[in-house]
Regions:
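Sequence/structural segment immediately N-terminal to covalent heme-attachment motifs in c-type
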Residues: 38-44
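Conserved N-terminal glycine/acidic-rich loop preference
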Residues: 85
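Histidine-centered nuclease catalytic patch
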Residues: 29-37, 49-82, 91-99
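A boundary/linker detector
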Residues: 1-38, 52-57, 102-186
């Protein structure tokens, strides 16, 4: 799977709140996702793309979905990165904060700084910028999902959507919001 954007250790993106729980893996049936995942992992030579500190890899590769989120409410799949579990955590500071609190985020920030080759203050700034972008994007309630990176190459059968396949798909995490707002009694 060729990269549309260069790999960047510095670019951390948090998932907007309305899209929590959403992923290509969660939208596809297992057979479709496994094809995409396996291609991403084997195209990297079954190695972690991040290749951070020696001895930090546990040998298990995970497929990290790289999405871009724009102000118009379009979420676009850009790339799938094979990452070891330890490196994968570096790109999910929101999850770490939710599960381990500020102490966990502080530990993650130190690891991120070492792996990215930056000072701790710079790592904190990058995570803060990601949290700021997250708060803005989380205000958008309707999202259009663009999986065109993989859908022309792999048949993606939808699991959660009421579509036979995925490509461009509107996602409304609150499907009854329009009915409630349109109700004459509201």
């Amino acid at each position: 799977m060729s990269a549309q954007t260069p790999f960047s250790k510095q670019d951390v993106r948090l998932i907007p709140k309305p899209l929590w729980g959403f992923s290509l893996a969660s939208l596809c049936v297992a057979s479709s996702w496994n094809i995409v995942r396996d291609e991403a992992l084997t195209s990297s030579g079954s190695q972690c793309r991040f290749r951070c500190l020696p001895g930090r890899h546990d040998g298990t590769l995970e497929a990290h979905e790289r999405w871009s989120y724009d102000q118009s409410g379009t979420v676009t799949l850009q790339e799938i990165w094979p990452l070891c579990r330890n490196c994968h955590e570096l790109f999910h500071p929101g999850r770490t904060l939710a599960h381990s609190g500020q102490a966990g985020l502080d530990r993650l920030t130190r690891r991120y700084a070492a792996a990215a080759g930056v000072e701790r203050r710079e790592a904190q700034r990058r995570y803060a910028a990601a949290f700021h972008s997250h708060s803005i994007a989380s205000k958008i309630q309707r999202w259009t999902i663009d999986t065109s990176l993989v859908s022309p190459h792999f048949p993606l059968k939808a699991k959660r959507a009421k579509l036979a396949s995925l490509g461009l798909h509107s996602w409304n995490p609150y499907p009854f919001a329009d009915a409630i707002l349109a109700s004459p009694n509201a």
